[in-house]
Amino acid sequence: MNYDIIDAKYIEGYKLELIFKDGKKGIVDLSVYIHKGGVFSRFTDIEYFKQFYVNREIGTLCWPDGLDIAPETLYHVATGEPLPVWTKTEKAVA
């Protein structure tokens, strides 16, 4: 998929430069994930965060314990391109 990440470089703090399969690249600031809690609460430890790697099999960023972020979400944040339609949820009909 074009959303697949082929390379990632640490910049500073929670900022990474990502390069995608379609040649586009951009910078993402993943500090917003700290406030999401749950599995992302691990990001409060910057040394943990820096252990990211690109899993080429699934085309996204991963961390050693299996945590990952959807590549289409990262593509949207890095490039400003809209999220694919299939990622949007429909409102429930009452």
Please place each PLM-identified region on the residue numbering.
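Motif-centric detector for short Cys/His coordination patterns
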Residues: 1-94
